[in-house]
């Protein structure tokens, strides 16, 4: 695993994509778009109002958690872990937590597991998991 320290969160694009400035060391940093690995969240920019509502909720949750965090690390499998759209694919770790925030989003009903195949759209399941979670 490769680790990159986030110096600054520039923008939360949606529930599974963020723009960040990462520290490469020696006072060198780079701005990158990061896609959270292994998850898919409801879209926040869609005409489907039920999906949009859930998508905006997870976007706001992610924004809030990033603002609260004192340490943000992106972990990747390879030094250049970019996906087909040029985004870095990585696991988000907040405040030195061993479990990634990606996994937390799945466990609490804010995201589905995603391996790059067919996307899920079972919003009812997400709502049930959210109601049961304490996030």
Cite the ranges covered by each PLM segment.
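Small beta-barrel nucleic-acid-binding modules, primarily SNase/OB-fold domains
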Residues: 1-135
